[in-house]
Amino acid sequence: MAILQDEVIVNGMRLRNRIAMPPLTTNYGSEEGIVTEDIIKYYSERSKDVGLVIVEASAVRADGRILRGSLGLWEDGQVAGMASLAASIKKLGAAAVVQISHAGARCFPAGGDMQGASPSGFAFRPDVAPLTMSPAQIDQMIVDFADAAARAAEAGFDGVEIHGAHFYLISQFLSPLTNQRQDRYGGDARARATFALEVVRSVREKLGKGYPIFFRLNAVEKVAGGQTLEDALVVSKLLADEGVDALHISLIANSSWKEVDGQRFLVASSAFPKDQPAGANVSATAAIKEAAGLPVIAVGKLGEGDVAAESVRDLPIDIVAIGRQMIADPDAAGKILAGKGDEIVRCDECMTCFATIGSGKPMGCKVNRNLPGSRRSA
């Protein structure tokens, strides 16, 4: 897999190879959003061989957590733990980036002034009433993203990733399904990107030109009325013009609706179904790279080394992210790079990882019983 061993440079940040570990929510943090020993161990085990580690969604506000045990960067007291985490990743040779996020109307119901924040009142959970944000609340949220990014830099992370995918807050503004605003934050794809662009601008002003900023974006949303690839192409170019350094391209891979007390709620997932072929999002990622002219990270069942290598060799993909396979086998990246893919302990796509966090538990894995979540549920 020689082609995966190539170095990649993103705004001065050197990646020793083309494999990244993407931000996978674990629910291993404390209720105060602070790094725990379980978090340090989990990331250290997966930092030995990859070029880049993107730490899971870390909330910019306490009311923006995805789960009770989500990490946080909303206050200064969280920086020391984040610094320990960044150092533990970097000492093993990987670049360390942290994803900053607000879950919006998909948040954990812990209260707060902007619990359920949304562009126009689209509900995702029966226990969180959506809050249609005022212009003043939008302005405050932009400040919160910039402040969280500054704490990430203070903690020693090499870069930040702004979470604009998966129907969390920024994604809710980008999607025509969830953004029905009539002011400057709603309308066509360009107008719906206004909030995202203002977040990027504020983060860039806070961190300076030399600090790497990634942005995670849905290529498509596989739900009626969702964001299309054409929308994503428009948005990606706008993000590039605003100063984003790299795009991490995900998607809403499947969705359904559930009814609770007569109200319908969207259930959406970024995980490819078991019958979806590996690399199914790669061609869309390549199209976005061409539109934006930026380095891109591809995702989507790329734990098969051959598919990852083909994505780089045959399409203009810069970095491949290997997620669920790294949960099942922390050494998967090293085995792929060494040409020993047949030795990987395979993820069987059972979705235990998603099911455990979906029920509010620490992430577990049926294949890897050494995960903190697997041990606790054993």
Question: Language-model features: where?
Answer:
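Flavin-dependent oxidoreductase catalytic cores
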Residues: M1-A378
